[in-house]
Swiss-Prot record:
Top EC category: hydrolase
NCBIfam families per UniProt: arg_catab_astE, PRK05324.1
The family this protein is said to belong to: Belongs to the AspA/AstE family. Succinylglutamate desuccinylase subfamily.
Organism name: Pseudomonas fluorescens (strain SBW25)
Main function: Transforms N(2)-succinylglutamate into succinate and glutamate.
InterPro entries: AspA/AstE_fam, AstE_AspA_cat, Aste_AspA_hybrid_dom, SuccinylGlu_desuccinylase
Reactions it catalyzes: N-succinyl-L-glutamate + H2O = L-glutamate + succinate
Protein name: Succinylglutamate desuccinylase
Cofactor notes: Binds 1 zinc ion per subunit.
Length: 334
């Protein structure tokens, strides 16, 4: 196997490869760009005009997605996967990956769309670098652009595998992309309705990519992800890379949700009235007092069918401590 196929091994060891560019036996170029960043380029005659960005490790302890990208890279380096797409593989927070921690000081996935400019430290610098790597990769005109940012969650979930679809004024959410996610094993998609500061929000809003944050299960250490089943996603990614993806327009069984409200933590007095082990997609009854903060701020459930995702009262002041979502239909899709 080509040495550049061992990007994860190089990254965890903090080493640069001796050779920055290598070719597989069938002419696929693998090019090391910087720590945790590797571009795969098919021979010109096989290039189908699509660009795919695959990122993981934005949170360093979310290892199942990292291992998935590692397997795909190994397959390409061995010549078992024969790309027709350009692919950029990114491991996000490399130092946190080495330490087995979610992040060191700042949550990298809250530092995009310019937010890194308002912060200092290595994680703000890394977010800026990731933006630049993505911007450069998606700079070629006339090509399709797709970004999957792969994660696992801090807590359990009543719907284990789901996607978050960013929002931009004037753009419609794509039925075709949701059918593709359905085929890849996603059980639900959250359609967002405001701008955000995540990596996929940046690539969707600024770089005109179709972009999705994919949540694949519970976060576990390296080598302990037997309980995270990513087989359908892995197959679909191979098909996208190789240009052999079967056409599908089916949304059968895919649950769609819309954001109703975000719960923002304003002060250290913030209280979230949920058990510490509450699962994502837990239902909340109308009238339930969800949270309280200074100045008599109260979040009371008003919505029918409301559910909570990403509840986290420990976030820094000013950040999102949870999202209230409600069921929606495919009538909103383009």
């Amino acid at each position: 196997m080509l040495a550049l196929g061992k990007l994860l091994e190089l990254t965890l060891a903090g080493r640069e490869p001796a050779q920055k560019i290598q070719l597989t036996v069938d002419g696929v170029q693998m090019r090391w760009l910087s720590e945790g960043a590797l571009e795969v380029r098919p021979p010109e005659a096989r290039d189908n005009g699509s660009d795919l960005l695959l990122s993981s490790g934005i949170h360093g302890n979310e290892t199942a997605p990292i291992e998935l990208l590692d397997r795909l890279l190994h397959g390409i380096a061995r010549g078992e996967i024969k790309p027709r797409s350009r692919v950029l593989f990114l491991f996000g927070n490399t130092e946190a990956m080495r330490r087995g921690e979610r992040y060191l000081e700042l949550d990298v996935n809250r530092l995009f769309n310019g937010r890194h400019e308002k912060n200092i430290g290595p994680e703000a610098m890394r977010a800026a670098e990731l933006e630049q790597l993505a911007r450069s990769f998606f700079s070629l005109p006339g090509r399709s652009r797709l970004h999957y940012d792969l994660h696992t969650a801090i807590r359990g979930s009543k719907i284990e595998q789901f996607a978050l679809y960013p929002w931009k004024e004037g753009r419609q959410h794509s039925r075709h992309q949701l059918a593709r996610l359905n085929a890849a094993g996603m059980q639900a998609v959250l359609l967002q309705n405001k701008t955000s500061i995540t990596f996929t929000a940046f690539t969707y809003e600024q770089l005109e990519a179709e972009a999705f944050t994919l949540e694949l299960g519970k976060a576990r250490p390296f080598g302990q992800n037997q309980g995270v089943n990513v087989s359908r996603l892995e197959l679909r990614l191979k098909q996208i890379i190789e240009g052999t993806e079967p056409e599908t327009d089916s949304l059968d069984g895919l649950k769609l949700f819309a954001v109703s409200r975000e719960v923002i933590k304003h002060s250290d007095a913030f209280l979230l009235h949920l058990p510490a082990d509450v699962e994502n997609f837990s239902e909340l009854e109308k009238g339930y007092l969800l949270a309280e903060d200074v100045a008599k701020t109260r979040w009371v459930i008003e919505e029918e069918g409301a559910r909570i995702i990403f509840p986290n009262p420990k976030v820094k002041n000013g950040l999102r401590a949870g999202i209230l979502i409600v069921p929606t239909t495919d009538a909103v899709l383009g």
